[in-house]
Amino acid sequence: MLVGGMPQAVNAYLDTNNFSKVDIAKRRILKLYEDDFLKIDPSGRASVMFRSIPGQLSRNAIRYVPYSAVGKVDDDKMTELLKDLEDSKTVNMCYHVDDPQVGMGLTKNIEQFKMFVCDTGLFITLAFWDKKFTENIIYEKLLSDKLPANLGYVYENLVAQMLVASGNELYYHTWPRDEKHYYEIDFLLSRGAKICPVEVKSSNYRSHASLDEFCRIHSSRILWRYLIYTKDYAKDSETFLIPPYMVPFI
């Protein structure tokens, strides 16, 4: 998860066993991405939108807000920027479904979405871009789960990457809990004539209020329900609790 799957990063880890060297390799890759973004969009907005992905996800907002990253842009230009980013294959787009059911594309909301980085190793480097390189100590704390940060968004990015690699399109769903808060299902999968809601946790925390409420409302539409967390496989009533490495098999 920390190294990612880019060949240059993997080779750097195998050759040096040093996360700082790995991070330098990943920064070179991201610099190439940035150069390509500038060819597509000389204004630099596409590059800024890409770099802002970790920050947008860490806010636990229900959508990516492009205007908070690049300021005021006319709607046609924003549509073009988003299309260019999606076509670049450097990001995985996850669209909101207004009515979660089989045929989720029918109620796909193209104005409400989240963006994930195509490679979680690159995502880690982007998240800690404020340093010249991400030091070994940060990687070690990430490995031991001792970094004082909410890492839920890292696991969301990882799950998004694995779901796309397994041939899934990405969808999510939110609905009001009260006047100020929302329930959220991180990912929705279509399986046969049913759907499978997926919730992602960054620890062994087993609470799943959103999952329970979603399945109560849409009980007739549910095939399986999954909570992805950092412990071993288990089952909590009707909910399958699975570690991230099992995601390709759901």
Where are these regions (language model features)?
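Accessory nucleic acid-recognition modules appended to NTPase machines
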Residues: 6, 10-184, 189
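Conserved catalytic cores of phosphodiester-cleaving nucleases, focusing on short active-site segments
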Residues: 159, 163, 185-204, 225
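Amphipathic alpha-helical segments of the small helical/lid subdomains adjacent to P-loop NTPase cores
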Residues: 1-5
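Domain-level recognition of nuclease-like catalytic cores that cleave nucleotide substrates
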Residues: 230-250
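Arginine/glycine-rich "motif VI" loop of SF2 helicases in the C-terminal RecA-like domain
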Residues: 214-221
